[in-house]
Amino acid sequence: MKQIKKLLVANRGEIAIRIFRAAAELDISTVAIYSNEDKSSLHRYKADESYLVGSDLGPAESYLNIERIIDVAKQANVDAIHPGYGFLSENEQFARRCAEEGIKFIGPHLEHLDMFGDKVKARTTAIKADLPVIPGTDGPIKSYELAKEFAEEAGFPLMIKATSGGGGKGMRIVREESELEDAFHRAKSEAEKSFGNSEVYIERYIDNPKHIEVQVIGDEHGNIVHLFERDCSVQRRHQKVVEVAPSVGLSPTLRQRICDAAIQLMENIKYVNAGTVEFLVSGDEFFFIEVNPRVQVEHTITEMVTGIDIVKTQILVAAGADLFGEEINMPQQKDITTLGYAIQCRITTEDPLNDFMPDTGTIIAYRSSGGFGVRLDAGDGFQGAEISPYYDSLLVKLSTHAISFKQAEEKMVRSLREMRIRGVKTNIPFLINVMKNKKFTSGDYTTKFIEETPELFDIQPSLDRGTKTLEYIGNVTINGFPNVEKRPKPDYELASIPTVSSSKIASFSGTKQLLDEVGPKGVAEWVKKQDDVLLTDTTFRDAHQSLLATRVRTKDMINIASKTADVFKDGFSLEMWGGATFDVAYNFLKENPWERLERLRKAIPNVLFQMLLRASNAVGYKNYPDNVIHKFVQESAKAGIDVFRIFDSLNWVDQMKVANEAVQEAGKISEGTICYTGDILNPERSNIYTLEYYVKLAKELEREGFHILAIKDMAGLLKPKAAYELIGELKSAVDLPIHLHTHDTSGNGLLTYKQAIDAGVDIIDTAVASMSGLTSQPSANSLYYALNGFPRHLRTDIEGMESLSHYWSTVRTYYSDFESDIKSPNTEIYQHEMPGGQYSNLSQQAKSLGLGERFDEVKDMYRRVNFLFGDIVKVTPSSKVVGDMALYMVQNDLDEQSVITDGYKLDFPESVVSFFKGEIGQPVNGFNKDLQAVILKGQEALTARPGEYLEPVDFEKVRELLEEEQQGPVTEQDIISYVLYPKVYEQYIQTRNQYGNLSLLDTPTFFFGMRNGETVEIEIDKGKRLIIKLETISEPDENGNRTIYYAMNGQARRIYIKDENVHTNANVKPKADKSNPSHIGAQMPGSVTEVKVSVGETVKANQPLLITEAMKMETTIQAPFDGVIKQVTVNNGDTIATGDLLIEIEKATD
């Protein structure tokens, strides 16, 4: 035996590392080669020396260039080369050049490479050794005509195979004559590209066989043994995916016959070194396919079940050792046995749901499995590894070994689940499905297993919550939160969270239990019998909608939920859902409003939950088909809503009937609502909104069967004296409990409530002290003390109320960026009549449009627009119409006259057009006909209830659409959300997929990210907590990307974030020339939702050209005249600023 002192591995990745380890155990120095693309690959560092093979060579050529590799070997003074598998491992010329240079090639002899490197020669060799072979051509088929001739004789199905190589390349199954020609030419072409040899041969295709290979090893002394078989039947396109040793599905007799055949072949040719003899097995028949004259990827599992190191044996055999000598110490064939079973899974960056397309990118997290009976053979599986498109997508080979196949499979599932690989897609979920499939676990699978088992692809995407959370925090840290001033994260006080035990809450029996017991009518009767006034708390909805632009997040409500359940155990209801909270949750807070409802319902089981329902607008800004309203109410009731406050923004009772019917069907409480506007004390203010008007409406609502009558004073216009008169008249006119809602903008709210209570009101809306006043509701805490000594009082726990107020006073500071400009009582409300819930939202809109400094003008314009539109009731969505028009007129310096005179050439906000089309409803005094004509520009207006014109939504079609888009099941809640807000819902899903469940983050981190050195804890599930520390942030690179270094649960993580404030290649957008009528410019900043035309297209006057959106306000840009589109400067999704050129039209000539 000649000792090998220095060994070069002509390969890369995990097999190179495997060989280095074997050599190190034999005290042999090692040399690695690498390409330019592999400079950071792990195998380079696992050798004693490593050398770049040709800086001018491509990624594959570096490992295929024989002369360059030989040069490195000579310079490094190596005396042996191991080729691994793939690349040059079966290349006869490479082995010959090694021999010529006096370098030992660790592999079979040249004649073996020659006979097995060509599949036709291999077949001939097998026939000579008397092995059964698949009927086929005697040699390569030179032309399609000869292929066709053979097919006519042999019949179908057939397999066309490349004579060279392996790995499933150059192979095609042909099942009928029509497929033959294309398959023949494709197989030849693929063979040429893969192996540099286009020769193919044809054989009979064995349908549905097992693929069994036998591991053999021979030495230079004529000794040959087999190490039993491996089952490689789990394949995709003839490439192995999972291997098992030994095969579960073979009988002992058939196993022995196959292994004997393998030995028979190799002894016949005096084979040397490691190789595998491959067979197809069908029933009790088996057929020789080929020999792989090299080490195989799956050699690991044979090593595990036999205890024999195949790679070390290869090296020692090449050095001249005897298999049965003391260096190798191989047992005699009769003494070689297997212990238990082993399974190998190849973990790759392939995406099974995208036709196994290899993914590329940076591995940002890598956590291995391990433990008893687990083996890992890793290549580029490590954190920070750049996965390129140049090489095999294999990251690591995971092998498990156990005494039984079932235990090995269980160990594999555990190990696969334990792996954490982030930054690239992997096939791990697919492999888990393979392991758990009954066909696999029984051993009753064939080479068609993957093809015939579609349930293997029922893959739930990895939650990857840690990485998604880090990416969101990184992005908001670097780029800030939309409409929040970009600044360092403030050092907020941590809110003290009072809690109440779940057992105590479970003991409460409140209005929720009363409803379940006596039903809606029973609750109404109970309310009327109460001496004290009852409370509805609005802190969870209208209070923060009015004060903080609806921005309060679910987490801050959940934190205080148990205490709220305790404090309001004697209250009537908690208003906590509906209105603007629905779309704002999706759109701005990036959380699911249904999840909020269900989580709060679970935490507060004892008090009625109340929502604001915009009648036929549901929680949207337009009318929806009747079946949408029914479905929305049905789903809301199931999720936890008990009281539906139903209103129409124009007080049109016809619009409220469908919603009332739906609520009654659901067995819930229906509040018929009158929206209060004007001033019943001042006849000069309006001859429309009189006391008689409201009494008439109340009687109409009673006739419709509503359970409770609500007065919604959305702007806080109801003065104390007016409240006394109105409530008194209504109590006389109808036999319904009366529920009053107001806003404290003027500072008169408490007195208004006192007068209403004296007049007999049954329920009032208040908020806890720190979330009350101004545009919110009056303070419940203050009202408690104000009513001391009076006959009617509040049933509430005042100490508990103070505790809630302390909590909210701290939490409110987190939302300071969304506070409105009103800092004190403001009697301007009696002039502009803006709803409290709209004030802070409109202020935010104005700021986003660059009108923050002109908000006083916006408020005045709001008043003027109201009278321009005919003095309408102003509450969502009608208030949005007035607000959109006010912003539009201030932005474009318009007044009432210019709207009438120049309106024909103006593109009005979509909500305004919709209003004048009658899509929201009919104002009590009708429309201003002149203004309607200008705004509609010939469009026809509705004259009846919009729902009568709308086709029912086909929910099953929506389900199919969403399931296709989301690649999985969808809920009824998803369906109704999409119907109400398709774009908003889709954007939310996109954000959820990108960043995960953001409602779990604490609010300061959600809005501001993290400071350097800061640590936050995020509970992502029961008993699962992420502890995240932001270590440091790099400077931006040349592309504007920053690297953020975290420690997550003590493990280093890196995330790459594009800094949007770093301009690498400035893209200056052209501006519209105001004097050029052909230039269509952006009238407001925002984004492009949809471009409807293309260059060269002929358009007509008033034809929609594109749709823009700014802060939920859509505008359709129309052609000012007939013409041809000369240029379009924007695309869907582009951000635009006021004055940006969008489209240029060449006017048509007469």
Curated annotation (Swiss-Prot):
InterPro entries on file: Aldolase_TIM, ATP-grasp, BC-like_N, Biotin_carboxylation_dom, Biotin_COase_C, Biotin_lipoyl, Carboxylase_cons_dom, CbamoylP_synth_lsu-like_ATP-bd
Sequence positions bearing N6-biotinyllysine? K1112
The first-level EC class reads ligase
**What GO molecular function terms would the record report?**
ATP binding; identical protein binding; metal ion binding; pyruvate carboxylase activity
UniProt binding sites for ATP: K119, K161, H211, E278
Annotated residues that bind substrate are located at R541, D542, A543, H544, Q545
> What is the active site of this protein?
R294
Q: Which residues carry this modification: N6-carboxylysine?
A: K712
Domain named Biotin carboxylation: which ranges?
3-455
Q: Might you report a single GO cellular component term?
A: cytoplasm
Pfam families associated with the record: Biotin_carb_C, Biotin_carb_N, Biotin_lipoyl, CPSase_L_D2, HMGL-like, PYC_OADA
Q: Which residues form the ATP-grasp domain?
A: 123-319
Known consequence of changing R614A? Complete loss of catalytic activity
PROSITE patterns the record matches? ATP_GRASP, BC, BIOTINYL_LIPOYL, CPSASE_1, CPSASE_2, PYR_CT
Pyruvate carboxyltransferase domain: from which residue to which, for each copy? 533-802
- Biotinyl-binding domain boundaries: 1071-1146
Q: What does it catalyze?
A: hydrogencarbonate + pyruvate + ATP = oxaloacetate + ADP + phosphate + H(+)
- Report the EC code(s) recorded for this entry: 6.4.1.1
Per the record, what is the consequence of mutating K411A? Complete loss of catalytic activity
Effect seen on changing T876A: Complete loss of catalytic activity
Assembly information from the UniProt record: Homotetramer.
| Task performed by this protein | Catalyzes a 2-step reaction, involving the ATP-dependent carboxylation of the covalently attached biotin in the first step and the transfer of the carboxyl group to pyruvate in the second.
What name does this protein carry? Pyruvate carboxylase
Phylogenetic lineage: Bacteria, Bacillati, Bacillota, Bacilli, Bacillales
Gene for this protein?
pycA
